[in-house]
């Protein structure tokens, strides 16, 4: 084999190894967003729930500040339980429908159903809970210890 071919082969292998270490984007984020908007009939965009209280958003800690924040904590806990069962909630695509009573999971089994149930329950909980503007984008360092 020619040295140039070896260099090309080495470059391909190195680039594949590098690509393998890049984490994939969450697949079900769009599904969960759509479920939230289905449950609340489009009255509040899903991004409003991203920086709410101590648990709605990236990571949660402390005591939930209200009912809506408790919904987010329950969703986090549901994902934690799914992970214990070797499911990957943020990367599990599932099937569901939006009906007059909100989101409903299709009859799937295993991880897809588990994650779908977590998201549907949370979306319905969000729709029922009041949104307190004072708890949006709070200082989590102060309020969530």
Swiss-Prot record:
SMART domains: PA2c. GO terms for biological process: arachidonate secretion; lipid catabolic process; phospholipid metabolic process. The keyword RNA-binding does not apply. GO terms for cellular component: extracellular region. It is found in: Secreted. Expressed by the venom gland. One of its GO terms (molecular function) is phospholipid binding. The keyword Nucleotide-binding does not apply. CDD domains: PLA2c. Keywords: Calcium, Disulfide bond, Hydrolase, Lipid degradation, Lipid metabolism, Metal-binding, Secreted, Signal. Residues 22-27 form a propeptide. Disulfide bonds join 38-98, 54-144, 56-72, 71-125, 78-118, 87-111, 105-116. Gene3D superfamilies: Phospholipase A2 domain. Coiled coil: none annotated. Ca(2+) binds at residues 55, 57, 76. SUPFAM superfamilies: Phospholipase A2, PLA2 (SSF48619). Its cofactor is Ca(2+). The active site is at 75, 119. Residues 1-21 form the signal peptide. Its EC number is 3.1.1.4. Binds 1 Ca(2+) ion. PLA2 catalyzes the calcium-dependent hydrolysis of the 2-acyl groups in 3-sn-phosphoglycerides. Belongs to the phospholipase A2 family. Group I subfamily. D49 sub-subfamily. This is Acidic phospholipase A2.
């Amino acid at each position: 084999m020619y040295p140039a071919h070896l260099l090309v082969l080495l470059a391909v292998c190195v680039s594949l190894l590098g690509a393998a270490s890049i984490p994939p984007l969450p697949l079900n984020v769009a599904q969960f967003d759509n479920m939230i908007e289905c449950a609340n009939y489009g009255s509040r965009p899903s991004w409003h729930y991203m920086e709410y209280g101590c648990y709605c958003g990236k990571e949660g800690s402390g005591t939930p500040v209200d009912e809506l924040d408790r919904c987010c904590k329950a969703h986090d806990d549901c994902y934690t339980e799914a992970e214990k069962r070797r499911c990957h909630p943020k990367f599990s695509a599932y099937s569901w429908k939006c009906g007059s009573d909100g989101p409903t999971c299709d009859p799937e089994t295993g991880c897809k159903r588990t994650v779908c149930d977590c998201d549907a329950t949370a979306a319905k909980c969000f729709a029922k809970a009041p949104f307190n503007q004072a708890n949006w984008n709070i200082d989590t360092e102060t309020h969530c210890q």
